[in-house]
């Protein structure tokens, strides 16, 4: 039996800005994403897809999406399927226009607004992408229409192990400022939806700019760090929201014969391999 695992890479919160602009005058998010893409292309075995879990750009501007597209094109050119979803810094229309034909950014229904869809990956594993964007608001939520579509996507393959992706974390983390803008509207309904579908093995998200591990219903929830800047780790109840120049990173989700769904943290940078033991 071939024991080669299947890999899904999760990048998150690249916050691409207008060319030449730095976040907080310090962070070159384009250079950070370029490095992440270079590292993804070096991963072996070759990933079966790349998920980017929201806050793709910083202000939802078409010029930012144009730069994001350019930065992600090496993945497209390498034949890696892209799965994109919006975060609170994104705008659906410009995102869909920039990536039409290059990535899954809509399910294709005429007049659809929410970016929700499923990809069946080898292994097998079903990736269900959900849209928690509430335009003009930092927190996330699901309305009845999106919850109904999520239910339909999960009901299509109840027999297939499933990973659900959204931008906003569906539970508190102890980061008070971020918890105030987590998934809010429809949270109880989303938890009930996950509970009703035992095939959901993992829920993954972004937004936090940190790796965290939690749970909703029976499923583990893991958040990805940003490919650029991180949110400072301060668990005091009155801690302000602050950014930190901690190491960037991404997640690699692995599964396959004899291997349950396992999530690994990869850190940005060139790390010396000191010995083969």
Q: What label would you give each PLM region?
A:
Residues 250-277:
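A short C-terminal boundary segment appended to hydrolase-like catalytic domains
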Residues 22, 141, 157-204, 208, ...:
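Active-site-proximal segments of metal-dependent phosphoesterases and phosphodiesterases across multiple
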Residues 62-156, 186-190, 195-199, 217, ...:
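Extended active-site neighborhood of metal-dependent phosphoesterases/phosphodiesterases
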Residues 5-18, 124-134, 163-165, 219-225, ...:
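Active-site-proximal beta-strand elements of phosphoester/diester hydrolases
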Residues 224-235:
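His/Asp/Glu-enriched short active-site or ligand-binding loop at hydrolase and phosphoryl-transfer sites
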Residues 16-20, 58-61, 84, 88-96, ...:
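Active-site environment of divalent metal-dependent phosphoester hydrolases
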Residues 1-67, 114, 173-176:
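N-terminal active-site segment of His-dependent metallophosphoesterases
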Residues 10-12, 49-54, 81-87, 131, ...:
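Active-site neighborhood of phospho(di)ester-bond hydrolases with catalytic His/Asp-centered motifs
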């Amino acid at each position: 039996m071939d024991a080669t695992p299947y890999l899904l890479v999760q990048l998150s919160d690249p916050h691409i800005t207008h060319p030449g602009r730095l976040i907080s005058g310090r962070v070159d998010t384009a250079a950070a994403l370029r490095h992440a893409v270079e590292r993804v292309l070096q991963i072996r075995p070759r990933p079966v897809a790349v998920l980017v879990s929201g806050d793709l750009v910083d202000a939802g501007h078409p010029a930012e999406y144009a730069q994001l597209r350019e930065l992600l094109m090496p993945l497209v050119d390498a034949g890696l399927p892209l799965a994109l979803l919006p975060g609170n810094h994104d705008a659906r229309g410009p995102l869909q226009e920039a990536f039409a034909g290059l990535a899954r950014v809509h399910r294709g229904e005429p007049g659809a607004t929410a970016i929700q869809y499923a990809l069946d990956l080898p292994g097998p594993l079903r990736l269900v992408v959900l849209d928690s964007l509430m335009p003009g608001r930092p927190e996330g939520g699901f309305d009845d229409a999106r919850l109904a579509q999520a239910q339909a996507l999960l009901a299509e393959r109840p027999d297939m192990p499933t990973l659900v992706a959204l931008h906003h974390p569906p539970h508190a983390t102890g980061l008070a400022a971020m918890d105030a803008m987590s998934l809010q509207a429809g949270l109880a309904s989303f938890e009930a939806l996950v509970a009703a579908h035992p095939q959901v093995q993992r829920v993954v998200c972004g937004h936090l700019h940190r790796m965290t591990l939690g749970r909703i219903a029976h499923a583990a929830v893991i958040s990805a760090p940003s490919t650029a800047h991180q949110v400072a780790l301060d668990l005091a109840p009155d801690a302000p929201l602050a950014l930190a120049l901690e190491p960037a990173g991404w997640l690699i989700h692995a599964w396959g014969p004899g291997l349950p769904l396992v999530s690994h943290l990869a850190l940005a940078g060139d790390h010396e391999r000191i010995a083969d033991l």
